[in-house]
A protein has these predicted regions:
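ABC ATP-binding cassette signature C-motif
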Residues: 1-178
């Protein structure tokens, strides 16, 4: 059986927000991992335009430094930012007041997703690749993510099974069939 990914040909333009859809096992996550260099291309090649900086959210969730607080987790990665800037970003992802002092070890799945997304939004990436970013998020968390992405001016390629989220974010659809 030939992989459906061997036959993909697309051009993504600046500012597009493309939802990648298809049945489980068709290669959506493989496509994302290939585009960020975590997996080799199965065939052919891909090329990024000039000055493209990618940011990747993996549905498997990033590993955090054990024992660190939510605040420290961001601050250690972005020491040039002051406390107010860090707390503003955390607030956009629903970490308010004492939430920022929780250790990452006690965070729920949804809180870990929100923290990963907050870290991603601080990167100077102009092309976000998001693999199932709404997994583990409750309605309020999804709304916070939608708001952050709607304020984002770069390009987004994302995998999601959440039809409401797709409708709110996507400007185009890439459907992968098996």
């Amino acid at each position: 059986m030939r992989s459906p990914l061997c036959e993909i040909s697309l051009e993504i333009l600046s500012g597009q927000r493309i939802a990648v859809l298809g049945p489980n096992g068709c290669g959506k996550s493989t496509l994302m991992k290939t585009l960020v260099g975590d997996l080799p291309a199965l065939g052919g090649d891909y090329l990024y335009g000039h000055q493209i900086e990618t940011g990747y959210f993996d549905q498997q969730l990033a590993q955090f430094s054990s024992g660190k607080t939510v605040l420290e987790e961001l601050w250690d990665d972005y020491p040039e930012l002051d406390r107010t800037q860090i707390r503003t970003v955390l607030g956009r992802f629903l970490f308010t007041s004492d939430d920022v002092f929780k250790t990452v070890d006690v965070l729920s799945g949804g809180e870990k997703v929100r923290l990963s997304l907050a870290k991603l939004m601080l990167r100077q990436a102009n092309f976000l690749l998001l693999d199932e970013p709404t997994n583990h998020l409750d309605i309020v968390g999804k709304e916070a993510l939608e708001e952050a992405l709607n304020g984002y001016t770069g390009t987004i390629l994302f995998v999601s099974h959440d039809r409401y989220f797709i409708k709110k974010i996507a400007t185009a659809i890439l459907h992968i069939d098996m």
